[in-house]
Curated annotation (Swiss-Prot):
Keyword Hydrolase attached: yes
Binding-site list for substrate: 83
Record keywords: Hydrolase, Protein phosphatase
Pfam families to which the protein is assigned, alphabetical: Y_phosphatase
EC numbers, comma separated: 3.1.3.48
Catalyzed reactions: O-phospho-L-tyrosyl-[protein] + H2O = L-tyrosyl-[protein] + phosphate
Similarity annotation: Belongs to the protein-tyrosine phosphatase family.
Name the UniProt record assigns to this protein: Tyrosine-protein phosphatase 21
Amino acid sequence: WLMIVEKECRVIVMLAKCYEAGKKKCQKYWPDSKDTLTFGQIKVFNAEEVRYSGFLVRKFQIESVEKMITMEVFQYQYTNWPDHSVPYTTSNLVRMHKNVIQLLAEIGGDAPMVV
């Protein structure tokens, strides 16, 4: 989260699930819906989770005590990638990509996207 705040990243794209075939593949680095986690001087509040066909969009409220800023960060998580394979169709992935591009156009700026 320190990197997110330092670079003012507004969008995170995640293509993996936390578990694949029962094995942990990714550390869950965000709080559950409507919960807050604190990472040093940074508080992360999961303000909203919206489920679409094939992906989730989470909206986080980030507060940096040290930098005295608050910011909104959006996380897109693709949830239809099958274990040890490739998606049967790309329609959900393409729809998520279009959502990300639209959001980037709306929020503007030149901050990097985290993938």
